[in-house]
């Protein structure tokens, strides 16, 4: 199977990954379950690769996977991805994110991980 279903149907899974991707770009590091982090890592690497091309078409493709909300008064999530994050990785060919396993969650002992940009 090329992807994990994360215990959700297609629309719920897409909304979850969209929210996690938006949060990752805004905060540049988030803590989530290990399986969600691994799925998000695939999407995040594709998004950074898209942002390095920086054309109208790639902006529209990236907008499909993000909530383009304002971070502060003059910056949106899409602008941060295409200006700040992509400029860090111009010479890098892949592996833009890393997943670090942490201690299990206290309530249900779910395996947790931190996903962050390298």
UniProtKB/Swiss-Prot annotation:
Keywords: Ribonucleoprotein, Ribosomal protein. Signal peptide: none annotated. GO terms for biological process: translation. One of its GO terms (cellular component) is large ribosomal subunit. It comes from the Bacteria. GO terms for molecular function: structural constituent of ribosome. Pfam families: Ribosomal_L17 (PF01196). Gene3D superfamilies: Ribosomal protein L17. HAMAP family: Ribosomal_bL17. This is Large ribosomal subunit protein bL17. It comes from Aster yellows witches'-broom phytoplasma (strain AYWB).
């Amino acid at each position: 199977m090329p992807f994990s279903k994360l215990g959700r149907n297609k629309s719920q899974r897409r909304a979850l990954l969209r929210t996690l991707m938006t949060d990752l770009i805004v905060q540049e590091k988030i803590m989530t379950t290990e399986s969600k982090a691994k799925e998000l890592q695939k999407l995040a690497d594709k998004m950074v690769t898209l942002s390095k091309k920086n054309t109208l078409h790639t902006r529209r493709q990236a907008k499909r996977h993000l909530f383009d909300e304002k971070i502060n008064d003059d910056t949106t999530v899409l602008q941060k991805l295409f200006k700040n994050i992509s400029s860090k990785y111009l010479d890098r060919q892949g592996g833009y994110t890393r997943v670090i396993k942490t201690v299990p969650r206290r309530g249900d002992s779910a395996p947790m991980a931190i996903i962050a940009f390298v």
